[in-house]
């Protein structure tokens, strides 16, 4: 039993130090683009509409299993910072930040819960430890708009 606890402690220690290193080193090219290419490109790749085209004909594109194009750094950060502030965070979130309800794209981050959590942690590290904010540019309902101070916490290193 003692060996089991020692092993569990070692795993947690390595996981913690690995997450810290990832938080400092996560970049679009090295970490996010490979996940995107594997998990997201089929619906959000080069054949998808840009954000404005998608918003103009959302039902048509959703019926064709196409979301807004995010296959470049520039396209992806439009769904993080502006004009669709927080969209990536809201859709990929596991629900721990949204009252227990995961975002509608969380399920596509991996085929197992472990893979989904690993990929989510990579996205969170890339956005920044304090930048994973689910707010929008404008207030909606009882959720206030994102503040300049909160926007300043978004990192998204290329």
Regions picked out by a protein language model, each given a short descriptive name:
Residues 11-14, 61:
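Sterically constrained small-residue positions within well-ordered secondary structures
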Residues 1-8:
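Bacterial N-terminal signal peptides that target proteins for export
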Residues 13-21:
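C-terminal segment of classical bacterial N-terminal signal peptides
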Residues 23-158:
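Aromatic- and Gly/Pro-enriched helix-to-coil junctions and flexible linker segments
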């Amino acid at each position: 039993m003692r060996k089991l606890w020692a092993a569990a402690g070692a795993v947690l220690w390595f996981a913690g130090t690995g997450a810290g290193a990832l938080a400092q080193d996560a970049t679009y090219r090295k970490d996010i683009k490979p996940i995107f290419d594997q998990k997201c490109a089929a619906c959000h790749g080069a054949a998808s509409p840009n954000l404005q085209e998608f918003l103009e004909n959302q039902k048509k594109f959703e019926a064709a299993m196409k979301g807004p194009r995010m296959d470049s750094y520039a396209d992806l950060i439009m769904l993080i910072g502006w004009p669709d502030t927080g969209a990536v965070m809201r859709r990929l979130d596991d629900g721990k930040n949204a009252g227990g309800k995961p975002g509608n794209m969380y399920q596509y981050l991996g085929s197992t819960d472990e893979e989904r959590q690993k990929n989510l942690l990579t996205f969170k590290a890339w956005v920044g430890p304090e930048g994973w904010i689910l707010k929008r540019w404008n207030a909606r309902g009882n959720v206030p708009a994102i503040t300049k101070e909160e926007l300043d916490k978004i990192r998204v290193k290329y």
